[in-house]
């Protein structure tokens, strides 16, 4: 298992004379698993300049989506100490991001990241992770590992799409069991477009 802050990318192979239009950044697979790491927060911009003469003043647009998950008990109680850990799978995430256009492409994959309990165990959550954009209504799955070895699993499609530049908070309520902005040099980064999704998981 890995930390919520882990992020990785598969860099393109750059070949002299090859067009960047034909290259892409890719997801990096978690070793000995079928899922992938979250990615780094990526921005994109173009500007025609004279190298060595013009200053870079490009307007940067976010090329990734941010996702945060907050899991609570429906009744507001603390989660049981019998819960060992929780983690999230988010599916239907594009596998690649074109290096030239920053457009998502390729097949769809599943991203995995962990949830951490707060001090009073009233919620399990993560810092926002970055992912490549998704297809509409991606599937989210929550896994609850019990200390007795049992593994509970719930899944549901989101009502929102993880598009580039969106910052989505998913609130999961169970029966029973935010980002800095600013500039870098002469670059201005677009603000996140924030959205929310709520899921209620009934006790079975």
Give a label for each model feature.
Residues 176-204:
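Intrinsically disordered, low-complexity repeat and linker tracts
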